[in-house]
Amino acid sequence: HYDDFCKAWLIECKRILKDNGSIWVIGSYHNIFRLGYHLQNLDYWLLNDVIWRKNNPMPNFRGTRFTNAHETLIWASKNKKSKYTFNYQSLKCLNDDLQMRSDWMLPICNGKERLKKNNGKKVHSTQKPESLLHRIILATTNKGDAIFDPFLGTGTTAVVAKKLGRKYYGIEKDKKYFKAAYDRISKTKIIEEDYLDTIENNRSKPRIPFGSLVELGIIKPGTV
């Protein structure tokens, strides 16, 4: 039944996904390989698998296995010919001007960001950190784009989308999660406008060999 369910929602996501859009799925060893299997069978085009390495993972208290210190994300376009968005330069700026790698060291959701009930218990057991969604959304969408999360949970995707000036849509059937998400999104404000503009990809600009600049007299030898 789980495989039928996964296949069904991935089909619907592909139906509404724009030709220049892309999809992200996340999971642990329990389900991510099955999701990847369905993505490929449905002719999504896999672009990257990304490892979210948690720098503060929960330990394996029984000591019977390795500590589960990462989750896997799969990024895919609608098909092989899709012209998807990838803000390469923006990611370099987040990474000390180095090309962003596919292994991301980010903390799990905790502190003030973690939603808790009055009794101190977590509202949602797998609430994702905003930093993770921030990187995904900044990397693969532009200001004004629409983002859809079919499993909204407590609203992290929508919160980050709103902060970054994106449109957001989501589905959540659990009433407790829905209320938490609604309250959280309502309190969220868009961040500084200047920050929302992605940095232009230099690869799209025409390039002139350095030697040609010297030959044309634009640059003199020894001045650079």
Residue ranges and their predicted role:
Residues H1-A180, P221-V224:
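Core catalytic lobe of class I
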